[in-house]
Amino acid sequence: MELKKDINAVSIDMLLIVHSEKRRAAQGTLSDQQANPSSLLQRGGGFQGVGNGVRRWQKLEGNDFHENLVEKQHPQQPQVITSYNSQGTQLTVEVHPRDAMPQLLKKFSLAKRLQGDKNGNTRPRQPGGKDAHAYPWDRSSLKSMSLDLQQFEKLDIYASQVTAKSGLDELVSDLLQEAHTDLERVRAIWIWICHHIEYDIAAAQEKDRQAFKPTDILRTQKTNCDGYAGLFERMCRLAGVQCMTVPGYSKGFGYQTGQSFSGEFDHAWNAVYLEGRWHLVDSTWGSGLVDTITSKFTFLYNEFYFLTHPALFIEDHFPDNKNWQLLKPPQSLRQFENNMYHKSEFYNKGMLSAHPETSMIRTVNGKATVTIESCAPTLFMFMLNGKQEHGLLSLRKNGMKLEVYPPTMGTHKLQIFAKGNSDIYSSVLEYTLKCNYVDMGVQLPAELHQPVGPSWFSEQMGIMKPSHPDPIIHTSDGRCSISFSVEEGINVLASLHGDDGPITEETQRRYIFQLHREKQTELKVQLPHAGKFALKIFVKKRQEPGNYIFVFNYLVCCANTKVNWPMFPESFGNWGQDNELLEPLSGVLPANRNVPFKLKLHGIAKVLVKGQDTWPLTLNHEGYWEGSCSTAGCQEVYVMVLENANHNFYSYILKYKVNAQ
């Protein structure tokens, strides 16, 4: 219908209400309480059964090691469609359940209308082309607009400390005391909600869903995702900032890789209008997390969900209206279901991309490879079916590489965790791994921990310039020698681990002999048999108390079944870090032989080798103590030293066994 301009014409907002029996049947009849005009939204909080009675849950982003969770909510947002003719006449159509109060009628009854923009418009405009951001993400920023978070420090502190003394109007007024732009107003509201409103776990567990009113939220300081979104919208409107609540699907707890979404929406968030464009926020996921073990909410602020770049927001938020994706091109529901889900901590910890880019991956010849690119050095770990086994994870300067070898055919769960400056690893990625072939030739030692091979982290811990930069060492004769520079004041400890049954901690170190030459450390390794071994490297600051810290390990492989090397000699506490043994290196000496000895010791007055008899060693011009001793008639041979020439007390430093005749 065309309306001609006339001086006597009257502008009329026409409301057409269309009842859908299918929509009503799918969503159910709302209660009288939910239809209350004072309700923020025509939907309840908490969780409800879905289909076969399985409950949906919503994860409050925060990503602790236990995958902390809360329940998903089910928005039932009415559809509002607005069209304009060439003369500017507006027709608004709303589709909603039969027994629900129309949203537009409720808006007409509000005592306070949304403050208009400069053009006098009272209703927020729908998103258009100028709001859209390019997809995929261009890596330019985690935010949809340029922000300097340091400029918010004073405002954030102020907003987080404001208390709700009475009503919502006064609260918003107090928050705006230090906010002078629309961006600062939105920031103050966001910070206050994220630091004061906790997720209402008890309400979420009730069978009857309830609508959360702003007055109730302020009184209890609790709500669900509907309440978070509704409160954020209401406070923004009171502050004169255009804001909308957006319902849709989300990838929270309970989400299974590759799952399909249908039926009722399970989450709600907000779009806010700033500097001529729409932007996205989720105060529910910005506020904290719920621990699955204790079922307690913990405030854990997550900056990621404030003005998130739409190309990142779409990874776990799919709106009911594709225009609210704010993307060009928009993603389909099928794409949303199939796309890789990078959790917020993936980006919070500086990661940029992961390969493969699909959440479902298959092994090739029994192996799957995952790589991650990051903008800064980051520590990683992984779990395959809940265990840190069957994989080789090597750190790179800007990321990591993981090779996984599933031990059985079938479907496996692969989780990847990352750690920034904190001491807590956070879940950042999850893959579903399908394996149709097992490489029986790959049997990794159970004691092979992560990471494998030297990296920026080992340099940071004082180990530099390794002779073997690769994580895997192959030896044909069962022996190898590894050397590296060691930072001043750092002690190094190494141990060898196989899968041939339990062995003592002492035995684990007896197949490694450690030599020190100035700032250079050499590890001589002899394998007891063929197989795969984990060579673990530990460090400790010499002047500090405490235990040695694990840094990395090598995977040492030998296929020669004839290998059967004995242990190295046993060393005692007086064997110094800078001592050097040239011979004999075998810890087991032949019987009835004269065995040559040669070693370098520092600060020693005399050296003796004691078998059945005692033989002195002499100091040559190169600084080595050398000589020989007979193994006849003895089972053990000791090397003893006298540190002070004025004393007669000798200390044992090395012990050898003699083969039985």
UniProtKB/Swiss-Prot annotation:
<dbReference type="InterPro" id="IPR052557">
    <property type="entry name" value="CAP/Cytokinesis_protein"/>
</dbReference>
<dbReference type="GO" id="GO:0008233">
    <property type="term" value="F:peptidase activity"/>
</dbReference>
<feature type="active site">
    <location>
        <position position="225"/>
    </location>
</feature>
<keyword id="KW-0645">Protease</keyword>
<keyword id="KW-0378">Hydrolase</keyword>
<dbReference type="GO" id="GO:0005856">
    <property type="term" value="C:cytoskeleton"/>
</dbReference>
<dbReference type="GO" id="GO:0007517">
    <property type="term" value="P:muscle organ development"/>
</dbReference>
<feature type="active site">
    <location>
        <position position="267"/>
    </location>
</feature>
<keyword id="KW-1060">Myofibrillar myopathy</keyword>
<dbReference type="Pfam" id="PF23265">
    <property type="entry name" value="Ig-like_KY"/>
</dbReference>
<feature type="active site">
    <location>
        <position position="282"/>
    </location>
</feature>
<comment type="function">
    <text>Probable cytoskeleton-associated protease required for normal muscle growth. Involved in function, maturation and stabilization of the neuromuscular junction. May act by cleaving muscle-specific proteins such as FLNC.</text>
</comment>
<dbReference type="InterPro" id="IPR056564">
    <property type="entry name" value="Ig-like_KY"/>
</dbReference>
<dbReference type="InterPro" id="IPR038765">
    <property type="entry name" value="Papain-like_cys_pep_sf"/>
</dbReference>
<dbReference type="GO" id="GO:0007528">
    <property type="term" value="P:neuromuscular junction development"/>
</dbReference>
<comment type="subunit">
    <text>Interacts with IGFN1 and FLNC.</text>
</comment>
<feature type="region of interest" description="Disordered">
    <location>
        <begin position="28"/>
        <end position="47"/>
    </location>
</feature>
<dbReference type="GO" id="GO:0030018">
    <property type="term" value="C:Z disc"/>
</dbReference>
<keyword id="KW-0206">Cytoskeleton</keyword>
<feature type="compositionally biased region" description="Polar residues">
    <location>
        <begin position="28"/>
        <end position="41"/>
    </location>
</feature>
<dbReference type="GO" id="GO:0005737">
    <property type="term" value="C:cytoplasm"/>
</dbReference>
<dbReference type="GO" id="GO:0006508">
    <property type="term" value="P:proteolysis"/>
</dbReference>
<feature type="region of interest" description="Disordered">
    <location>
        <begin position="115"/>
        <end position="136"/>
    </location>
</feature>
<dbReference type="Pfam" id="PF01841">
    <property type="entry name" value="Transglut_core"/>
</dbReference>
<keyword id="KW-0963">Cytoplasm</keyword>
<comment type="similarity">
    <text>Belongs to the transglutaminase-like superfamily.</text>
</comment>
<dbReference type="InterPro" id="IPR002931">
    <property type="entry name" value="Transglutaminase-like"/>
</dbReference>
<protein>
    <recommendedName>
        <fullName>Kyphoscoliosis peptidase</fullName>
        <ecNumber>3.4.-.-</ecNumber>
    </recommendedName>
</protein>
